[in-house]
């Protein structure tokens, strides 16, 4: 295929569509419940990238009618203090979703904090209870990025059942839950990772190839089966030889676009979908807590 025939999986456009759907849903639920849905975001320290992500999430909340409760703590905040805040938010009737913005300063135990969140308010879908529900094929709050990938494939009517899917990356944030979601839709799954031998021979088998490894432009055209669906979860800031900064994914976009049938852009692919699924989880909690 030539580069001009590789179609884009436009996450940005779909995220806007989902936001409009959520806006309508909230307008229907608000009179019954008597208040808007609420999302509490906890940020520790002054990581500039995290600050941008939090601001984007708060702006997205405002667009759909979710009230956001920002909680910004200094970098030296203790584990105990944060756990106490989470416990308060668990009990707060205005709050339907709780999000801990990662990464955290090194002295904090992120996993322990995530475990403190009420599973029914777990906006990121990372609590062991919700991951366990995913393993069992039960309904629950799903991890935002993998859920965003699946929703994007669905929107473009990309058939998953019976396909060979390769997920490069095994993190609890993306790789593992996404593999389970693809399996749930009857794909045949391979998970590749840093210890995988002869990675290219595996990725070339993929009808659906997902890159989630955090290595800029790592997946090249030679690693991709012609006509494959390529989903790029990575987002990396690199400095080009001319000194300009650029955001790129884990896939060499220009090269792979000449081989793939579909490809996600970076930015504008999976990033907006992750935020859309976060909002959706918050509204699901809002509806579920009140059984409306």
Curated annotation (Swiss-Prot):
GO BP terms: L-histidine biosynthetic process; methionine biosynthetic process; purine nucleotide biosynthetic process; tetrahydrofolate interconversion
Keyword annotations: Amino-acid biosynthesis, Histidine biosynthesis, Hydrolase, Methionine biosynthesis, Multifunctional enzyme, NADP, One-carbon metabolism, Oxidoreductase, Purine biosynthesis
UniProt similarity note: Belongs to the tetrahydrofolate dehydrogenase/cyclohydrolase family.
Catalysed transformations (reactions): (6R)-5,10-methylene-5,6,7,8-tetrahydrofolate + NADP(+) = (6R)-5,10-methenyltetrahydrofolate + NADPH; (6R)-5,10-methenyltetrahydrofolate + H2O = (6R)-10-formyltetrahydrofolate + H(+)
Pathway named in the protein's UniProt entry: One-carbon metabolism; tetrahydrofolate interconversion
Protein name: Bifunctional protein FolD
Positions of NADP(+) binding: 169-171, 194, 235
Superkingdom of this protein's organism: Bacteria
Gene Ontology cellular component list: cytosol
Gene Ontology molecular function: methenyltetrahydrofolate cyclohydrolase activity; methylenetetrahydrofolate dehydrogenase (NADP+) activity
Pfam families: THF_DHG_CYH, THF_DHG_CYH_C
InterPro entries cross-referenced by the UniProt entry: Aminoacid_DH-like_N_sf, NAD(P)-bd_dom_sf, THF_DH/CycHdrlase, THF_DH/CycHdrlase_cat_dom, THF_DH/CycHdrlase_CS, THF_DH/CycHdrlase_NAD-bd_dom
Function (record text): Catalyzes the oxidation of 5,10-methylenetetrahydrofolate to 5,10-methenyltetrahydrofolate and then the hydrolysis of 5,10-methenyltetrahydrofolate to 10-formyltetrahydrofolate.
